[in-house]
Amino acid sequence: GILVLMHDNTIDRTTNGSGAVGDYSYQQLQQLYLKDAAGNLTNERIPTLEDALKKGKGKVYFNLDIVNKNVAVATMVALLKKLDMENEVLLYVSNNRNYAYDLKAANSTLLLHPMAKASDDITYFASSYTDNVQMMQLSTSDALAGAMTEDIKSKGWLLFSNIVGANDTNMLSDNYSGLVGMINKRINVVQTDYAELAAKYLKSKKYR
């Protein structure tokens, strides 16, 4: 099959179609149009993952949320090898140890992006994936509470969390408290739907 770039398991929110992504053929998906963030229909089609990766190759790092998306390990690994992008794509595995194991077994050089839901997740990935993990994720609540922060930092990993939701949309009203909260908790990578606003604010405050 052909991998496409789609965050949700269904196409209801992001296109003018409905149902599960996996229930459609690639040809059928190409008949649909994407919606913008406000839900307005655009003239854009659903991109293949390969096309999206090619656009950013050598320019950005990709963070792909593929866990629980029914993405076959062999298909994902083959695509990254084909594009020579094993070192440019971080594969989000949450704390799914079986999926992480299967990915590493298929290609020992892949970059994995796990999430710590408990301290034993940190211990596990630190002991078994020292060459694969450079960044660990915490939930928004755990990050703001400072939970497990020092343990993750002690491994030499970057710390990732997100402000998607109210803290994110608040930036549209010039309220950056959610972002500042992450900075104060020493979060290195903050996921946001408003990267340009966040970058402008960080630059104005000389954080970058």
Listing of model-derived features with the role each one plays in the protein:
Residues 39-41, 115-117, 123-208:
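C-terminal active-site rim and adjoining tail of enzyme catalytic domains
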Residues 1-58:
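An active-site metal/cofactor-coordinating segment within enzyme catalytic domains
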Residues 1, 8-9, 32, 67-69, ...:
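Active-site beta-loop-alpha junctions enriched in small/polar residues
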Residues 34, 54-57, 61, 81-85, ...:
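Sec-exported extracytoplasmic/periplasmic mature domains
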Residues 42-44, 62-69, 83-148, 190:
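Catalytic beta/alpha-barrel core
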Residues 18, 23-26, 82, 129-132, ...:
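Alpha-helix termination/capping residues and helix-transition junctions
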Residues 49, 55-69, 195:
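Active-site groove signature of glycoside hydrolases
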Residues 25, 45-49, 72, 76, ...:
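Stable alpha-helical elements in mature extracytoplasmic
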